[in-house]
């Protein structure tokens, strides 16, 4: 395990690899009807202005004090490894697996913080990572898309502690491949398992099908299922996975074909199969078929359960005109003695809030509490989003306080909503207060939270604070794939306000060798165009040359802009250098330089035209085209 720090140091600095995939999801042995509502139903040194990043306060449990102590050390020294290791060595921390896991969890999306701590712990005498710690680290690395490092860790586990390698690691790996739509790699995990002393069984294969079907690859899952029929004989679990996948995509004919295959295999559908089919009908808008299926279920001796009613209510809540029908289904459910649970109530609240009926949402909220069903953060989230749409900031704050009084503490998603609204309304100090409160409650901001704050600071002119948060986000390893909208807005505002050095500092933090950010042509184009727009032509050209050193060819309009700017400066030397490299790159890519150059010039001319003139010209052209034709020929042309 000691060699792992060397292996990962080599891998972590590279771009994410497609040869090794992540394994973040915990093993879920229940295969179908995920009852968590989807997106359809949920639609950073203090400054004199009170703006800045703060350290969180303590949690009250066994590890609380040490966790926050370590987290503060990581926050303060993560960009300077020698100082970080010295501070950790002098901290007097008693390492044990439970503490390591808590620290990794505390780091949240800040993968670099957890990674640095894991490496430091690896080097400590007398300490050895447990299976749970290694699995947690695998989750963090895979979430950072450092897949080479993930494989490096597993390989090191095989050499030093092979008994720590369990099938669940590979199940998580398959799920991460599936979520990235890398079906071939997901299937290849089955072939890799024997190399680590494990043989894939029916459970592992079932997890593979389940992962593919839940991530939109049901067609590929069907092929894998057919190809491996002999090795893994069909069972009800496999068919249920395929049925779920087809129903989720709204392909009911294929779903019915799965039912036929199921019967041919001598298998009878159970309540889960019926619920999946019911969900398929409901979300395809075929409510009459869904109701008929409910009646058929009763005839077959399957009394619809809360899952069945909930999928109907969720589907009905998608349409404003069918909210009354959703309530009728809810009443019918109670009439049949089926008690609604938190997901059912949340679906109703989500529907009312989605269509602006917040008062009815609160009414359902009160009703569920009276019946002993305690709302969750997801439930409150529906109402919070509705208040955000109406820009009701005070109501959001009141709801947060109400949640706290009821023992349901706001999660990261809820803070994101309220902070976003505060920034939108110009309440930057309130946004910072909420940020500080969030971190004090032990919540680590993710990329969404950082982006919200950065955009809020930028829009209100707090550019120094925006830069600080941006650099903090990058240093925590959260910004591995640039959010181009945020990057463009920040760089453009800095250059526009003549803060060129600050802009260069921002760019350097994502382009240096230690950064895990993925920089492509789009990111470089944003930076080069921002410099050019403010008249910094030579700097733009310098960065363009840097980009080409990385074997990235500038876009045609970027080349055309730089040539135009250099022509005005009478700087033929730099123009010749850039042109020579572009010609060479075009040749290597079997492109015509003349066509490339012409395309760039045409793009500049097109962008220089006022939009109104272009539309007017287009209309005039159409008028001339059809002038003098008869109605029949004009209709034919259209």
Swiss-Prot record:
Pfam families: PPR (PF01535), PPR_1 (PF12854), PPR_2 (PF13041). InterPro entries: Pentatricopeptide_rpt, PPR-containing_protein, TPR-like_helical_dom_sf. Keywords: Repeat. Gene3D superfamilies: Tetratricopeptide repeat domain. The keyword Repeat applies. Residues 604-638 are annotated as: Disordered. PPR repeats lie at residues 130-164, 166-200, 201-231, 235-269, 270-304, 305-340, 341-375, 376-410, 411-445, 446-480, 483-513, 520-554. It comes from the Eukaryota. Belongs to the PPR family. P subfamily. PANTHER family: MEMBRANE-ASSOCIATED SALT-INDUCIBLE PROTEIN-LIKE, OS03G0201400 PROTEIN. This is Pentatricopeptide repeat-containing protein At3g49730.
């Amino acid at each position: 395990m000691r060699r792992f720090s060397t292996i990962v140091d080599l891998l972590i600095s590279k771009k994410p690899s497609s040869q090794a995939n992540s394994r973040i999801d915990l093993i879920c042995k229940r295969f179908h009807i995920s009852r968590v509502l989807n997106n359809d139903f949920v639609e950073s040194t203090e400054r004199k202005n009170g703006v800045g990043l703060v350290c969180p306060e303590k949690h009250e449990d066994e590890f609380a004090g040490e966790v926050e102590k370590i987290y503060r050390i990581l926050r303060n020294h993560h960009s300077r490894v020698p100082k970080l290791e010295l501070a950790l060595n002098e901290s007097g921390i008693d390492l044990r697996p439970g503490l390591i896991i808590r620290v990794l969890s505390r780091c949240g999306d800040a993968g670099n913080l957890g990674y640095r701590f894991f490496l430091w712990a690896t080097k400590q005498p007398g300490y050895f990572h447990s299976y749970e710690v290694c699995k947690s680290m695998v989750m963090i690395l895979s979430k950072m898309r450092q897949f080479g490092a993930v494989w490096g860790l597993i390989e090191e586990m095989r050499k030093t502690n092979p008994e720590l390698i369990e099938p669940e690691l590979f199940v998580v790996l398959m799920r991460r491949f599936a979520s990235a739509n890398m079906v071939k790699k997901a299937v290849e995990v089955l072939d890799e398992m024997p190399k680590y002393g494990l043989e894939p069984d029916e459970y592992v294969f079932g997890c593979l099908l389940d992962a593919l079907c839940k991530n939109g690859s049901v067609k590929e899952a069907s092929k894998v299922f057919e190809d491996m029929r002999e090795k893994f004989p069909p069972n009800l679990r496999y068919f249920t996975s395929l049925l779920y996948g087809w129903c989720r995509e709204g392909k009911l004919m294929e779903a019915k074909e799965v039912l036929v295959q199921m019967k041919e295999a001598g298998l009878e559908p159970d309540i889960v199969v019926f619920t999946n089919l019911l969900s398929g009908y409901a979300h395809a808008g075929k409510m009459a078929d869904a109701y008929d299926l409910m009646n058929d279920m009763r005839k077959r001796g399957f009394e619809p359960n809360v899952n069945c009613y909930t999928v109907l209510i969720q589907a009905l809540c998608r349409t404003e005109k069918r909210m009354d029908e959703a309530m009728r289904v809810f009443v019918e459910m109670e009439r049949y003695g089926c008690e609604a649970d938190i997901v059912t109530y949340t679906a109703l609240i989500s529907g009312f809030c989605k269509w602006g009926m917040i008062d009815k949402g609160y009414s359902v909220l009160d009703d569920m509490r009276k019946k002993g069903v305690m709302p969750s953060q997801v439930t409150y989230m529906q109402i919070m989003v509705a208040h955000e749409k109406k820009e009701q900031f005070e109501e959001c704050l009141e709801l947060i306080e109400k949640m706290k009084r009821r023992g349901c503490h706001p999660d990261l998603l809820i803070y994101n909503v309220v902070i976003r609204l505060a920034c939108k309304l110009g309440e930057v100090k309130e946004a910072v207060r909420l940020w500080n409160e969030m971190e004090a409650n032990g919540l680590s901001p993710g990329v969404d939270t950082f982006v919200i704050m950065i955009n809020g600071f930028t829009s209100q002119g707090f550019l120094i604070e925006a830069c600080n948060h941006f650099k903090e986000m990058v240093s925590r390893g959260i910004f591995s794939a640039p959010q181009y909208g945020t990057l463009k807005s920040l760089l453009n505002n800095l250059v526009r306000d003549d803060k060129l050095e600050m802009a260069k500092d921002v760019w350097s933090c994502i382009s240096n060798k230690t950064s895990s950010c993925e920089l492509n042509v789009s990111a470089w184009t944003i930076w080069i165009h921002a410099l050019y727009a403010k008249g910094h032509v030579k700097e733009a050209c310098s960065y363009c040359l840097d980009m080409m050193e990385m074997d990235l060819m500038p876009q045609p309009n970027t080349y055309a802009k730089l040539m135009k700017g250099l022509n005005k400066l009478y700087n033929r030397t730099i123009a010749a250098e850039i042109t020579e490299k572009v010609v060479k790159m075009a040749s290597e890519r079997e492109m015509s330089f003349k066509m490339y150059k012409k395309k760039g010039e045409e793009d500049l001319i097109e962008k220089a035209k006022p939009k109104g003139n272009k539309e007017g010209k287009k209309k005039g052209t159409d008028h001339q085209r059809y002038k003098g034709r008869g109605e029949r020929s004009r209709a034919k042309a259209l």
